[in-house]
A protein has these predicted regions:
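Sec/Tat signal peptide C-region and signal peptidase I cleavage site
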Residues: 20-24
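N-terminal secretory signal peptides that target proteins for export/translocation
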Residues: 1-3
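Bacterial N-terminal signal peptides
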Residues: 5-17
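Sequence context surrounding c-type heme c attachment/ligation sites in exported
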Residues: 25-34, 38-70, 76-159
Length: 159
C-alpha cells in the first residue's frame, strides 16, 4: 500500500515536473497560459489523466475502503484540478489537430462546453459533501454521476 502511494506520488511529481515548463500562470492567476497550442494539448491531456486517476483512487477510498478521512487530500486536489478555471485556458481555439482528441465542435459550442465544466464542478462539490458526511452510499452514487458527467462531455467533444 505504501509502495503504491509512493509510486503514485513520484509519477504525479514527474508529470507535474514535465508539464510545468510548458505553461505559465496567467497574470491574473486565472489559470495557465500557453505559448503554443501543442503545449496546451499536452498539458490538458496530462491534467485530464491525473483527474481520471484521482477519481479511480477516490472510488477505492470511498467505496472499497469507506475512508473519508483518507480521501480528503484527493478530494481537495480534485476540486482544484476539475474546474473550468484550471482547465479551460488549455482549450485554445484551433488546438484540435494532431495529437489532440478534441473535436472542433468545442469552439463552435463554447458556452455549452463551459457549462459542462460547471456541471463537473457541481458533481465534485456533491461528492465532497457526501464524503464529509461519511455517507458512503451517496458518495458511491456521486462518483457514478461524476463519471457520467465526464462521459457525456467526452462523447460530444472528444474523438
Amino acid at each position: 500500500m505504501l509502495r503504491t502511494s509512493l509510486i503514485g506520488a513520484l509519477a504525479m511529481g514527474l508529470t507535474l515536473g514535465l508539464a510545468g515548463p510548458l505553461q505559465a500562470e496567467a497574470p491574473d492567476n486565472e489559470g495557465p497560459q500557453f505559448e503554443d497550442p501543442r503545449h496546451a494539448v499536452t498539458w490538458r491531456r496530462e491534467e485530464l489523466k491525473g483527474i481520471e486517476r484521482l477519481v479511480r483512487q477516490l472510488r477505492f477510498d470511498l467505496v472499497n475502503n469507506r475512508d473519508a478521512r483518507g480521501a480528503e487530500p484527493r478530494l481537495e486536489e480534485l476540486t482544484q484540478l476539475a474546474s473550468g478555471a484550471h482547465l479551460l485556458p488549455a482549450f485554445i481555439e484551433g488546438s484540435h489537430g494532431r495529437g489532440s482528441e478534441a473535436r472542433a465542435r468545442i469552439w463552435e459550442e463554447w458556452e455549452e462546453f463551459e457549462a459542462g465544466f460547471l456541471a463537473l464542478e457541481e458533481r465534485v462539490a456533491a461528492l465532497r459533501e457526501a464524503a464529509e458526511a461519511e455517507d458512503y452510499r451517496l458518495a458511491t452514487r456521486e462518483l457514478s454521476d461524476l463519471s457520467l458527467t465526464c462521459r457525456s462531455c467526452h462523447r460530444r467533444y472528444r474523438y
